[in-house]
Each structure stands twice: as structure tokens, then as C-alpha cells.
Design a protein with these regions (language model features):
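Juxtamembrane regions of bacterial inner-membrane/periplasmic proteins
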Residues: 2-237
Length: 237
């Protein structure tokens, strides 16, 4: 048994430790690189291109825009719709997680509690699914994003890679497709409608809006008024 430990387990343990260290180093360097370089592609886009769902177009639409070319209303709308404590939390909204757990345990419709940081990590680096491995990697990358990027960069990347409809990636492509409007000129109502489709962009359309999107966008507008521009100032600081 001592010989087995010496010649098998110890070398195997060293290899595993080197692999873990290499993975950590690689992921840190990758996140640092994407802090200053806009990603030419991302995991969610690659999955859609390789395994297109029903209704996916032959060519996708995407155009990267910097934060200063995105309407403040659009930035506020996605915070109001998806993650109202975005500026305050460190990547994980434990209050929202508790509310979602209570809701789900009480027999309500299953509700998630992913923050914008977690959604950015998932769309940028990971595959779809609900396995514990993927959730663990999502948490790891979300932590790295919070440690190595600022909130402004996280929101910018999110708005440039999220899918607003079949093959419509990013807010610039979405604004032009649905409203014929660039991202920097989107109105509050247009922004609210775009944010309203994010739970399921294959089921809902920003224009023409379904009754659900109309109700959801009115709720988002109300939340935007309550949050005010102070939320964006906190993100940009």
C-alpha cells in the first residue's frame, strides 16, 4: 500500500493539482483579456450556430457598441427588469435567491434568481443546462467578473451578447431590427419592450408586442421611474 501511494496516488495528485492551477490561471487571464478586448464570439453564439433551434436564421445579426453609444434608458431598463440590485451586490443576490427558493417551495412557478453578472458569465463562457458542474463554473466566472471588471463593463458586455430574438444578438442589432433605431437613440418605451422579451426571446417579440410584453414593459417602466438615474450612476462609479 505505501508503494501504491508513492508511485500512483502522489503523482496523480500532482497532475490534478497542476491541472487545477492551470485552469485557474487560464480563466483569470481570459477574463483579464476580455476586460479590454471585445469578444469576437461567445459560448451562447457558438452553441446557437452549431445547434440552431427552430426558427434560427441562416445568418445572425450583431454589431458591438460601447457603453456611451447605448441609450441610458436601455441600460436602466435591463437593470429594472433583470437585476435591480446589480450595483449593490458582488455577483450573487442572496435576497433574490431566498425569495426564489421560498416561491418555488411554496408551489409557485419555478423562478430563477440569476444576476446580470451570472447571466454574462453563462452567455460568455458556458453551455446551456442546469447541471451542478455548469452552475459551479458559472459561480466561478461570475466571481472573476466581479473581481476583475467593473459594473460598467459587465453591463456593456451583457447588452452586447444577449439574444433579443432568433439570431439577434446585442442591443444595437435588436434596436435596428425591431424599431429601426440605433442603440443610443432607444426611447424608454422601446427599451422596456426589449428588456421585457429577455426571459424568452424565442417566445416574445418587442415589436409588435404581445399582451404579455405590453404588461411587462409597463411594469419595467414603473420600476425604471422608481430606480431613477441614481442606479446608473452607481454602476458607472
Amino acid at each position: 500500500m505505501p508503494l501504491i501511494k508513492r508511485y500512483v496516488f502522489r503523482p496523480l495528485l500532482k497532475v490534478m493539482l497542476w491541472l487545477v492551477a492551470g485552469w485557474i490561471g487560464f480563466s483569470v487571464l481570459l477574463v483579464l483579456l476580455l476586460k479590454v478586448v471585445d469578444p469576437p464570439f461567445w459560448s451562447w453564439l457558438v452553441q446557437r450556430e452549431l445547434f440552431p433551434p427552430s426558427g434560427y436564421p441562416d445568418e445572425y445579426a450583431h454589431r458591438w457598441v460601447a457603453t456611451d453609444r447605448i441609450s441610458p434608458a436601455m441600460r436602466l431598463a435591463v437593470i429594472a427588469a433583470e437585476d435591480q440590485r446589480f450595483a449593490a451586490h458582488s455577483g450573487f443576490d442572496f435576497k433574490a435567491i431566498k425569495r426564489a427558493l421560498d416561491h418555488n417551495l411554496n408551489g409557485g412557478r419555478v423562478r430563477g434568481a440569476s444576476t446580470l453578472t451570472q447571466q454574462t458569465a453563462k452567455n460568455l463562457f458556458l453551455w446551456s443546462g442546469r447541471s451542478w458542474v455548469r452552475k459551479g463554473l458559472e459561480a466561478w466566472f461570475a466571481l472573476l467578473l466581479e473581481l476583475l471588471w467593473d459594473k460598467r463593463r459587465i453591463l456593456e458586455v451583457y447588452l452586447n451578447i444577449v439574444e433579443f430574438g432568433p439570431g439577434i444578438y446585442g442591443i444595437e442589432a435588436a434596436g435596428r431590427y425591431y424599431f429601426g433605431t440605433p442603440a443610443q437613440a432607444l426611447s424608454s418605451l422601446q427599451a422596456a419592450r426589449l428588456a421585457a422579451v429577455l426571459p424568452n426571446p424565442y417566445r416574445y417579440r418587442a415589436n409588435p408586442p404581445s399582451p404579455y410584453v405590453q404588461r411587462r414593459s409597463q411594469w419595467i417602466l414603473q420600476q425604471m421611474r422608481q430606480l431613477g438615474t441614481i442606479s446608473l450612476k452607481a454602476v458607472d462609479d
